[in-house]
Amino acid sequence: KREALLRQITGIKKKLESKENREMELELQQLEDELEAIPVEKPRRFFADDCSSEALTNLLANNGGTLSVISSEGGIFDILAGRYSSTANLDTWLKAHCGDPISVDRMSREAEYISNPCLTAILTVQPNVLDCIMANTTMVGRGLLARFLYSFPTSRIGTRTFRTPGIPKEVRDKYRELIFRLMALPMGEEPQTLVLSQRAEEMIADYFEEHEQFMVEEGQIFPDWAAKYIGAILRIAGLLHAADMVEGENEISAETVGRAMEIGKYFLAHSMHAYSTMGADVNIAKAKFVW
C-alpha cells in the first residue's frame, strides 16, 4: 500500500509543478497523511553485536521487543561500563532480562515503549574479561552479572589435533531445522503462558527447598546469582518445551523440568567457579590454589 500511495503522491506533485490546483493540493495532503499513518516496515533484525544501550533499545523497539546480542569478544562490557558516556547504562539489559516494560522519552528522538522485551545474550570471552567485569562494582551491584549463566570449558591446548572433524551434517541439519521451525512460530499480540504439570511443580518445589539449604551452606560466594538459580531453571525448561515443539501444548512436563535441572546443575557449578575466581583478590586466589 505504501508503494501505491507513493506513486500517487509523485504523480500529483509532477502535475502541480506545471500549474496550481487547490483540489489536487488537498488530495496530496490527504495522501501524505495516509502515508504517514502507515508504519514503515523494516527488515527483521535477529542479532546484534557491540551496541550501546540506546541503540539496543531502538533495535528492540523496531523488532517486536526481541533480539539476541551475540559476540565472540567482550567489547559489549566496555560499552555497558560507559565507553560512550560517563556512567554505565544497564537499564535496558536489566529490564529485557525479566520482561519489564521499557519506556524511553528523550528530546533527541521519538519516544520508545516496549511492553514485553526479551533479550538473549551469548558472549564468548576470555577469562581476563570476566576478571574485569567481576571487579566492576556497578555491574555487580545492579545485578547484571547475576543474570548470566557461566560456562568454563576445560582448555584443550596441548591435546588438540590438526585434523579436527567438523560438526556432523546430520547434527547441522537438525539444528538448522529446529531454528527455522522456532522462527516460523507466530508472534501473537500477547505472550503465551506456560504452566507446570503437577509433577513438574512438585519437582521444582522440592528442588527449591534443597537449593535454599545450599544457599545457607555455600551460597555466600555468589548470593545474587544463586538467588536467581531456580528462576533460571524454569527459563531453561521453557526453552526446552519450545524446542520440543508440542503444538498447542502449554503444560511443561516433569521430564522437561528434569532435563532443565540437569542443565541447571552444570551452570550452577560453573557459575560458582566464576564468582569464586574471577575478579577475586590476587592473594585470595593464590590461597585457594594452594588449598
Residue ranges of each PLM-predicted region?
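Phosphate-handling catalytic cores of nucleic-acid transaction enzymes
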Residues: 1-291
